[in-house]
């Protein structure tokens, strides 16, 4: 059933297999946690990941997995590698800046999620961070702050974050001056000042307000 958005956690907590376990007890084995990163960035793609963990996994196998925002880059890199070893399936999907401009950020995020899910094969149920997305079908449970509650959603957040950060940092050489090695496309003051100085690159989201303001000659630091 489509979840209505339950949950809500602020402090640093260890995600659990509570939600996955309930579905496993119903006989489902291919439960995919899905999360996205990069939704609010000014440049680069929005990226989603889908992670299917083995039924009845010992949570100690992924004991350090948290919402990606609660981990430092070396920790994220370590756990992304460990997730790849432990998971039954991992899928990564992205939607480019051009697709974001063409579709809008919501539809592009949905597209990235659909692309990630297409890589993991059969999915019996989706655990989704945030609010329900009817386009993903009826077999989903949406959890507010799900990346802090569900281990598979937290795992997806890490996989997506590491993949996107690595891409943006590699583009720092191709598109120098914007500071992507550190800001990975987000709208820091350094990035906004670089936009004033250099103008947008092909990887910038021209439909986003700061870029629209730039085209109108109004962007500021």
UniProtKB/Swiss-Prot annotation:
A divalent metal cation binds at residues 35-36, 129. Keywords: Cytoplasm, Endonuclease, Hydrolase, Manganese, Metal-binding, Nuclease. The keyword Disulfide bond does not apply. It catalyses: Endonucleolytic cleavage to 5'-phosphomonoester. Residues 29-220 form the RNase H type-2 domain. It comes from the Bacteria. It is found in: Cytoplasm. It holds the Pfam family RNase_HII. GO terms for cellular component: cytoplasm; ribonuclease H2 complex. Transmembrane segments: none annotated. Residues 198-221 are annotated as: Disordered. HAMAP family: RNase_HII_B (MF_00052_B). Endonuclease that specifically degrades the RNA of RNA-DNA hybrids. This is Ribonuclease HII. The lineage of its organism: Bacteria, Bacillati, Cyanobacteriota, Cyanophyceae, Synechococcales.
